[in-house]
Every structure is written in C-alpha cells, then in structure tokens.
Regions:
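Extracellular loop and loop/strand-boundary signature of outer-membrane beta-barrel proteins
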Residues: 19-25, 76-82, 122-131, 173-179, ...
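Membrane-embedded beta-barrel scaffold of Gram-negative outer-membrane proteins
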Residues: 27-81, 87-89, 204-205
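Outer-membrane beta-barrel translocator domains and adjoining extracellular loop/strand segments
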Residues: 2-10, 16-17, 63-71, 112, ...
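C-terminal beta-signal and adjacent terminal beta-strands/loops
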Residues: 59, 151, 159-170, 193-248
C-alpha cells in the first residue's frame, strides 16, 4: 500500500485542516473478478447496428476505508485502514447505430450494486453504512452526431449519474450525515463547420453549450467551517463555448 496523490491534498473539514495517513498494519486490496459478455453486429441496408451486453462481478478483500479521524495539533488526521471486504456486481448494456455517414448514435447504461460485506463505521455520530460511498446504482451516456453536409456536423452528448450516497462532515452542518444525492443528467450540444483555406489547410469553427439543463449541485457548504470534500455531480454549471481549430 502507498499514499495516493489525493492523500497529500489538504482538505478543510469543519474549520480544521484534514489529512490522511496510512495505518501501520495496512494491507493491499485484493480483488477477484468475473465477467461475461455477448456482442452482436448486424447490417440492415444502409444501417449498421451493434449491441453489447456484459455482466460483471468483483469481490474485494481488505478493502480500503477511512476512519472519521482525530484532531492532533489542530489537524484532523484520518487513517486509511482495511475493512473486511466488499462486492460489486452489475450489468452493462451498450448500443451503436450508424446510417451511412449521415448519422451516428451510441448509448450505454450500467446497473450495479456496490456493498461492503459488513456495515462500515465512518463516523462517531452517523450510522454505519453497508453501501459504498459515491457509487451510483445507475449511470449511463449517449452521443449523437448528425452530418447533413460534409463540412457541417451537429453533435449531442450526455451523461446520466444516478443518486448516490455521499459523506457530509460536520462543521457547516451540526453533525456528520450520509446524504442521498439527486440524480443528474448533463447534456451538451455542439455545432462545427469546416472551411478549406488551402490545399492542405483546414479551418474549423465551433460553438455550443455544456450542461444545457444546468444540472448542478445546489447545496455547497459555505464559510470557514465548510466541508471542502462535499462536492458531487457535474463539474460545472451551464456554460457556453466557441472554438477555432486550424489543421494542416
């Protein structure tokens, strides 16, 4: 076992600096995995279709977990230790479709379950949890590209993240609590047009919107006693962009 880069980052929890140290007897995580899949390709005239189904199962032994921590010289020290184990299992469905060079679609969804073998005690004031934190039971994505004429392309993409359990440490709030977050659908749209400047020089102009529906966390902590680790969902709210690219 070794310290990860993120372990060296300093967090702010309840007005205290929080850091992670490794337990003296920390053992490496071990996993045993099994998966099976079926993949089908078919052509129907000008349409090409691909469908994939995959099941997976992973058993984790000596899984890493964090204590709620203790304050030493004004610094909250959280210790990474080994929990008894955990299991992750689920099913992935993925499909692709193409119609000539005019339209391309791709989408996928994963249904999964992530559980500790025994409830994990993560706080002195909050109940132990058997569900692994920050692991939604459902997540998925899609992409679509439409090219009505060769220089012009219209793109649509999105990701879906289901509800998940997230730790919220005391400070800004009165006591530690495990929060069931809402689900998020983050969709983006982009328009691009290619111009031929010279024999081997192309110019592309593009513009679009990211996170069209403004699916964004709305309960951030504030002030000096905030929990800086209480962040989830899409990384940015609705935003607009434009770009220029020259290739040769």
């Amino acid at each position: 076992p070794q310290a990860f880069d993120e372990d060296l980052h300093v967090e702010n929890v309840g007005g205290k600096v929080a850091m992670i140290e490794l337990a003296d007897n920390l053992k490496e995580e071990r996993s045993q995995s099994l998966s099976a899949s079926a993949d089908v390709y078919r052509r129907f005239g000008a349409f090409q279709i691909n469908f994939l189904i995959e099941g997976f199962y992973t058993k984790l032994s000596d899984v890493f977990a964090l204590t709620d921590g203790e304050v030493v010289d004004g610094v909250l020290i959280r210790t990474r230790h080994n929990a008894p184990g955990a299991r992750v299992m689920g099913l992935t469905l993925e499909g692709k479709m193409a119609y000539l060079s005019l339209l391309q679609l791709q989408a996928g969804v994963t249904l999964q379950q992530s559980r500790y073998d025994e409830p994990e005690k993560w706080s002195e004031t909050a109940p132990a949890e058997k569900k692994i934190f920050r692991t939604p039971n459902t997540y998925g994505y899609f992409t679509a590209t439409y090219t009505p004429i060769k220089p012009l392309s219209l793109s649509l993409s999105g990701t879906y993240t289901g509800s998940m359990l997230v730790q919220h440490m005391a400070g800004y709030i009165d006591k530690d609590v495990a929060v069931n977050t809402r689900d998020f659908f983050d969709m983006g749209v982009k328009v691009a047009y290619d111009f031929k400047l010279y024999k081997s020089v192309d110019l592309q102009l593009s513009a679009g919107v990211q996170n069209v529906f403004n699916a964004y966390q709305n309960d951030f902590d504030q002030g000096v006693e905030r929990d800086s680790g209480y962040i989830y969902g899409p990384a940015a709210p609705r935003s607009y962009f434009a770009g220029i690219k020259i290739s040769y």
